[in-house]
Amino acid sequence: MLLIGYFAYKRTSNLTDYMLGGRSLGPAVTALSAGAADMSGWLLMGLPGAMFSTGLSGAWIVIGLCLGAWANWLYVAPRLRTYTEKAGNSITIPGFLENRFGDQTKLLRLFSGIVILVFFTFYVSSGMVSGGVLFNSILGMDYHTGLWIVTGVVVAYTLFGGFLAVSWTDFVQGIIMFAALILVPIVTFFHTGGAGDTVAEIRSVDPDMFNIFKGTSVLGIISLFAWGLGYFGQPHIIVRFMAITSVKEIKRARRIGMGWMILSAVGAVLTGLGGIAYYHQRGMTLKDPETIFIQLGNILFHPIITGFLISAILAAIMSTISSQLLVTSSSLVEDLYKSMFRRSASDKELVFLGRLAVLAVSIVALVLAWEKNNTILGLVSYAWAGFGASFGPVVLLSLFWKRMTKWGALAGMIVGAATVIIWANAGLSDFLYEMIPGFAASLLSVFFVSILTQAPSQAVTDQFNDYQDTMSQ
């Protein structure tokens, strides 16, 4: 990872290179880096653990995420890649929103930049906590030592190599994750007697393990499906669309990305189900279902291979941290410092400050992670919904609706974020996932406020028409 960071450093000469890789990513790197940045440790721990605990009824979230990711690639990716270049060659989402609506007040950039800065700092901190806990629980290493190792490696390649380093390392980490999720279920099924014996063993534990509706409700299924809506508003994922070489490569990237995601998710599901059969055959019990991937690795493989499997989990955690860290740095430098205080700042100054911002945000996140605070980990439970509801409808409508105004965009972001926070803190999330009311409220706010406020200027309308003409070619 550090070697990749060094090579990326040698190829980084200006702010666009540092924050967006000079829009030079190929389809494979774009696809796998987006996937690795998205999934984090949940793919190798949370999802197999859910399958081990509840069976296939936990798979609804996988279906929702796959549909959301597919729609994101199909409808958002080509349009965002085209429009960000038309709108002042924007290199951040807040910058795109300001340029898209010709916002001279800078409120859009300021508000969205602050939201990204605050929430992603906690998000990064939660990733650091996960890394420290992994070192502590698997290797018996002191939590704080593990924290320093994860933070040190991620900060080093992100700080020096910027977007290219993050994308290339995410690509490698995506391959490691994929290989691990194919290897573990295959070997597990081999040791449980093949597919037929494995299925029979699982049915002997609980015949309803294969009932996808077990313990679910209509609202529960809708809530799990709604996770897919979050993709439209995740800055660390959709920024990958802005960095691909050309719009023509997005179709290939979509196929690679969705293939990786679906096969990896299936591997995670089969790992959990295979774990049920393996443990039951041998009369074994497991205290923490989320460790089933790690435990199978320890039992079934040579220590060298086990080390590779553990590195896959670390790769998942690190890829998400680095992506979120860079987006946070970008907002701090491009959307707050340059936009508000130093519009004449040189690229050299901004790249230096970008690296400084990576270090500063990392230090703050490390301090927050030091005490292994459960409140920080709890924040992540609705941060996905917060970004999805505040940015998702705004990004979608900005790409499709000419009449949308800057005031509509601002209202959508504020109402979406506020609805998610209020809904979650009112204890209503068990009834319905906060993404749904947040997304709906944001969508309605954008529409009604845009209709009730002055239409976009002729310059903004002309830019939208130019973008539409390019898309139709």
Curated annotation (Swiss-Prot):
Any one Gene Ontology molecular-function term assigned to this protein's record: proline:sodium symporter activity
Predominant localisation class: membrane
Keyword field: Cell membrane, Ion transport, Membrane, Sodium, Sodium transport, Symport, Transmembrane, Transmembrane helix, Transport
Phenotype seen when the gene is deleted: Deletion of the putBCP operon abolishes L-proline utilization.
GO cellular component term of the entry, any: plasma membrane
Transmembrane segments: 32-52, 56-76, 114-134, 146-166, 171-191, 218-238, 256-276, 299-319, 350-370, 376-396, 408-428, 431-451
Subcellular location: Cell membrane
Bilayer topology: Multi-pass membrane protein
Function of the molecule: Catalyzes the high-affinity uptake of extracellular proline. Important for the use of proline as a sole carbon and energy source or a sole nitrogen source.
Protein known as: High-affinity proline transporter PutP
Organism: Bacillus subtilis (strain 168)
Gene (UniProt): putP
